[in-house]
């Protein structure tokens, strides 16, 4: 069994959805996870914002336009009139849910129901098209097996049990279509795995079923050794370890959701990154194997805030560091990077939601310096401390760029540093 995930751009037009169908219709047992078609989630977020603010006229206009787009998509995708009618009826039924919200109260629970419609419609359209091609397939609803617990973490035991029950109901079927991103929560309410969550869905399904391989299909041929939007002449990296891939995803490689590696690593399931526009390309294989290439790839994470805490000596050193951790934990703000000395601590964060609260409390114990518009650049590879010389190469390459912070040693797989956003392109 393979699990294959296709993102929004891969199914974003009629032609691309038809192309994906050619990639999945063979007899190999597989579960196919689809995102909403490209741009749909953005439209649904705008509709949800209108509904939340009771901007009903704007919501009406956006719902009407999106409904028309999907009906046109179905008309272009399907030629069989009976299947076309079924598909359009399904679309109209899903949009009835949206129209209902223009009359009723609207909360964060209803917002998640709005956002779920994109994946529900894209998977239904693929299901109908495969039926037109006479390809046996079953449309599974992710709400029937994908669940997060009270801590908002996936309930893997529940997912495995319910998913196996679903598959057992369809003996002889090799192709299943389901939604990425969407799920139920511990209270049986509609919820989701946040932006980019379709990768996470595929990884959770692959882990639950102990799949042979998890394939993430995008519109680029694997993980590149640098950001192709910033640097010309990049090339795909053929092999990465789980840890290397996780570091690259966390530090800005957009091709992969950072959370999707941990479930695959749990059961040692390889993850392959492939290009739906060029399916013959080798892509990138992510596994538990670590090769000897010291430096593999570079990634950058924008919108970083750098904070330096200089102790005012109200607390002894170990209590000072403990207090910093306690206050960041209190406000549920994760640290992207941290370096410390006896009396100074520097951190980099990407979530400034509670920054004013954090600074207000820590000013009792430290002089605080805050700098925004920063970027973390991470150099990733097999960086065992015994391999001398690679640190010098990195520093030599950056000798003309001011480094605000350097982190090395906490991981065997990366050296990370904080720079001004304006220096990012030159650094990469």
Would you name each region that the model predicts?
Residues 1-256, 261, 413, 419-420:
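Nucleotide/pyrophosphate-binding catalytic subdomain
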Residues 241-313:
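A conserved active-site cap/scaffold subdomain adjacent to cofactor or substrate pockets
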Residues 137, 176-177, 271, 335, ...:
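Hydrophobic beta-strand scaffold residues
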Residues 284-428:
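A conserved regulatory-domain signal marking ACT and ACT-like small-molecule sensing domains
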Residues 8-9, 37-38, 182-183, 198, ...:
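Short, glycine-/Ser/Thr-/acidic-enriched flexible segments
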Residues 28, 135, 269, 333, ...:
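Short phosphate-binding/catalytic loops that engage adenosine nucleotides
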Residues 170-185, 248-272, 311-320, 371-386:
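Electropositive, surface-exposed helix/loop patches at the edges of structured domains
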């Amino acid at each position: 069994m393979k699990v294959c995930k296709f993102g929004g751009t891969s199914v974003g037009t009629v032609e691309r959805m038809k192309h994906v169908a050619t990639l999945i219709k063979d007899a190999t047992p597989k579960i196919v996870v689809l995102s909403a078609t490209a741009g749909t989630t953005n439209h649904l977020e705008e509709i949800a914002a209108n509904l939340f603010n009771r901007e009903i006229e704007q919501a009406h206009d956006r719902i009407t336009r999106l409904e028309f787009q999907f009906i046109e998509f179905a008309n272009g995708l399907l030629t069989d009139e009976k299947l076309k009618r079924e598909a359009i009826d399904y679309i109209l039924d899903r949009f009835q849910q949206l129209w209902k919200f223009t009359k009723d109260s609207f909360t964060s629970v209803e917002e998640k129901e709005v956002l779920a419609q994109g994946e529900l419609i894209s998977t239904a359209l693929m299901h109908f098209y495969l039926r037109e091609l006479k390809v046996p397939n079953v449309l599974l609803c992710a709400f029937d097996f994908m669940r997060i617990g009270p801590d908002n973490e996936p309930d893997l035991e529940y997912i495995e049990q319910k998913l196996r029950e679903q598959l057992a109901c369809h003996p002889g079927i090799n192709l299943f279509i389901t939604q990425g991103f969407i799920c139920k929560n511990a209270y049986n309410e509609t919820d989701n795995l946040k932006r980019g969550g379709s990768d996470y869905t595929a990884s959770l399904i692959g882990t639950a079923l102990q799949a042979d391989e998890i394939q993430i299909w995008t519109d680029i041929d694997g993980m590149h050794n640098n950001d192709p939007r910033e640097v010309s002449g990049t090339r795909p990296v053929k092999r990465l370890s789980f840890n290397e891939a996780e570091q690259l995803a966390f530090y800005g490689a957009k091709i992969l959701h950072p959370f999707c590696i941990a479930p695959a690593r749990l059961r040692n399931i390889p993850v392959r990154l492939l290009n739906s526009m060029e399916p013959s390309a080798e892509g990138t294989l992510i596994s538990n194997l670590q090769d000897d290439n010291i430096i593999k790839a570079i990634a950058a994470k924008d919108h970083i805030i750098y904070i330096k805490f200089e102790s005012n000596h109200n607390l002894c050193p170990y209590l000072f560091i403990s207090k910093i951790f306690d206050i960041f934990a209190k406000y549920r703000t994760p640290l992207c990077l941290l370096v410390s000395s006896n009396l100074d601590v520097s951190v980099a964060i990407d979530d400034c939601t509670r920054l004013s609260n954090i600074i207000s409390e820590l000013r009792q114990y430290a002089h605080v310096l805050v700098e925004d518009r920063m970027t973390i650049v991470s150099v990733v590879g097999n960086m065992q401390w015994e391999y001398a010389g690679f640190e010098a190469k990195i520093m030599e390459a950056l000798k003309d760029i001011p480094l605000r912070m350097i982190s090395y040693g906490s991981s065997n797989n990366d050296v990370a540093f904080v720079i001004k956003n304006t220096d990012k392109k030159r650094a990469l």
